[in-house]
Amino acid sequence: DQNGNYQSCEHEIAGVPLLSAMLSRIGAGKDMLAYCENMCRLHMRTHICFYMNLGEGQTNLLFDESICPHDLVLLAVCDARGKGGCTEKSDEEEQFLKERLAAYEKALSMPMPSGDMLIAQGMKAGRGMAQALKEARRLRLCGAGLEDAIRQTVIKFGKENDHE
């Protein structure tokens, strides 16, 4: 714009190959590359969660994709503050993200569905179990109770894993 503020649409996607190339040149290891790529890919979604006022379930799922949710919040806060000053809502966004991170950590402290729990409700062990567990975790992080997440998963994936 005329004030010298630049925005790069989809920089979180376009930046990943550049980031990987740069870090590889300086000898970053595989774990460091994975961490930095993950942070780069996800950091703009934190802003979307704030500006669209998405629910806890959505921020829980975002944080669950992150290698380090705490660092993702710190990166988003730094990104919002940009050139050293605060954006109009950067303090509010920081508070929002910290509250959502606390909600995510609380959700993680609650029991999560296990393969044994799904099997006890009639699912058969097999190739579909990993996908079923992923779905049960997603439901739990979105606010479903433990029993409800298990029940919905068994209904969706079938007691016999029919769609393997």
Put a short name on every predicted segment.
Residues 1-88:
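Divalent metal-dependent catalytic cores for phosphoryl transfer on phosphate-bearing substrates
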Residues 21, 81-164:
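Charged substrate- and nucleic-acid-binding regions of tRNA-handling and nucleotidyl-transfer enzymes
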